[in-house]
């Protein structure tokens, strides 16, 4: 007997969705930024919040023009919302991962149907690098989310 994600009841599907979200949320707020990139991004975001200078990211007093500022803006905005750097520095990557999963599912559903959409989301979620980047404070996951949004 063949089973597919389409055979799941709505309750089971919601349980699966909650399980995916819980897996991505696991450990949020339990670690400090890790070298090499994460501390630099957090320092630039902290400087934005402390000085009110959001247009040109800085690390301390030095202009930080090595990377696009979007990720640091998102980290700083996350801090304004949650008031905890332990959570705020990882929140943009987590939200971008959830957005990417949703956009992938919606696009696949529109193009090929619900069954294919379910497998597309599951296939993306079980990719190790996708989950690792969703739990890192690096630009990559936000770039993936924005690229997926542009294709959607």
Predicted segments, located by residue:
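Membrane-integral, polyisoprenol-dependent glycosyltransferases
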Residues: 2-152
